[in-house]
Swiss-Prot record:
SUPFAM superfamilies: P-loop containing nucleoside triphosphate hydrolases, TrpR-like. CDD domains: AAA (cd00009), Bac_DnaA_C (cd06571). This is Chromosomal replication initiator protein DnaA. Pfam families: Bac_DnaA, Bac_DnaA_C. Domain I is involved in oligomerization and binding regulators, domain II is flexibile and of varying length in different bacteria, domain III forms the AAA+ region, while domain IV binds dsDNA. InterPro entries: AAA+_ATPase, Chromosome_initiator_DnaA, Chromosome_initiator_DnaA-like, Chromosome_initiator_DnaA_CS, DnaA_C, DnaA_dom, DnaA_N_sf, P-loop_NTPase. Plays an essential role in the initiation and regulation of chromosomal replication. ATP-DnaA binds to the origin of replication (oriC) to initiate formation of the DNA replication initiation complex once per cell cycle. Binds the DnaA box (a 9 base pair repeat at the origin) and separates the double-stranded (ds)DNA. Forms a right-handed helical filament on oriC DNA; dsDNA binds to the exterior of the filament while single-stranded (ss)DNA is stabiized in the filament's interior. The DnaA box is 5'-TTATC[CA]A[CA]A-3' in this bacterium cycle. Multiple discrete DnaA-oriC complexes can be seen as DnaA levels increase. Binding of DnaA to oriC is increased by HobA; some chi-type structures can be seen by electron microscopy. Strand separation requires the DnaA boxes and adjacent DnaA-trio motifs but works equally well with ADP or ATP. Residues 324-457 are annotated as: Domain IV, binds dsDNA. One of its GO terms (cellular component) is plasma membrane. Changing L187A: No strand separation in vitro, wild-type ATP binding. One of its GO terms (molecular function) is lipid binding.
Amino acid sequence: MDTNNNIEKEILALVKQNPKVSLIEYENYFSQLKYNPNASKSDIAFFYAPNQVLCTTITAKYGALLKEILSQNKVGMHLAHSVDVRIEVAPKIQINAQSNINYKAIKTSVKDSYTFENFVVGSCNNTVYEIAKKVAQSDTPPYNPVLFYGGTGLGKTHILNAIGNHALEKHKKVVLVTSEDFLTDFLKHLDNKTMDSFKAKYRHCDFFLLDDAQFLQGKPKLEEEFFHTFNELHANSKQIVLISDRSPKNIAGLEDRLKSRFEWGITAKVMPPDLETKLSIVKQKCQLNQITLPEEVMEYIAQHISDNIRQMEGAIIKISVNANLMNASIDLNLAKTVLEDLQKDHAEGSSLENILLAVAQSLNLKSSEIKVSSRQKNVALARKLVVYFARLYTPNPTLSLAQFLDLKDHSSISKMYSGVKKMLEEEKSPFVLSLREEIKNRLNELNDKKTAFNSSE
């Protein structure tokens, strides 16, 4: 007779092979079920689901199908002709109390200076702000997980720490960690053979907050450990909040099962700030750094420095330092001179590949999707934006650009470029205006990385 472990594999294999169950459905639902041999009988198959939502969903949507599959197939447990299927919520796993965790040490990873009160809210980030506040204020997760994504320096880390600080005020156990630190800690415990302590540390908390989630990709052992950490936290209704620079589907090399779990709850994009929000940020940073700038200088910074909040703060400090060194008063002319190098457009000389990647990341598409003509609106817009930025920043002739985008008629390039240019000049689409800034920021980042790499060779 088959062992219980083989029975479980055999039952789940039957489900996976059934044509009525897609691979996505199997991964999202059935792969999480655990067969309970102790409760099962000859005519009843018992399974454990990690949480009530999954339990209810499978019972309602797939209960009849499960009974049909198991009734028609003889498996090692010798199921009767007519089989009843029961799915229950798994009992919560108790973590060994001997792992004496110093939560005070864990709390120090939350930066006290980042709060909801000093987060500048605008139309670009209002949705993210409201979701974050609701998550922080709720005793049980309203959405789980929550994933915020967007370009560098837009306030994602601030909002993550704000959630942590609010949760700590309610005496919740909070773990905030970057994926890099999570990896370092994982390897240390692995080498020391203290994985029980590692699991207790990250799974026995009320809020698990992970920054730079995109860096989990390409590390199979780490992804495996995070997968199980995620599952246990989720099963025990512990709030998970993830931060990434791109949407889950655009994290190349990340396991599909993790991408799937990242999208279980709610995903929201942090957009680049509009001019009004940028000016509010500049004023706030001046106040925090106790620096007084004339109104016209603050407006100049908001208009001419990138959307990266850290760069805006750097510009403020640079003006103040230079004014002190030169014993000069701060005015617009001084600001223009001091900030000249910060206004350099690093997008100049971009490769077509980098432009394609920047557009793809900004619109949550795959590069391969953009290179093929499509009637989908977001793909069509992406192709136009690739043309627009290629004409601005690359020396590529029209013919090679047409070949790059698989266009038979290279005269279409001029039409696509003119269409985007007109849209931007007339300012009829705030969305496209915002996209232009985001794509430029991503190009700057990609080109800066390339420059840094070349200089190190």
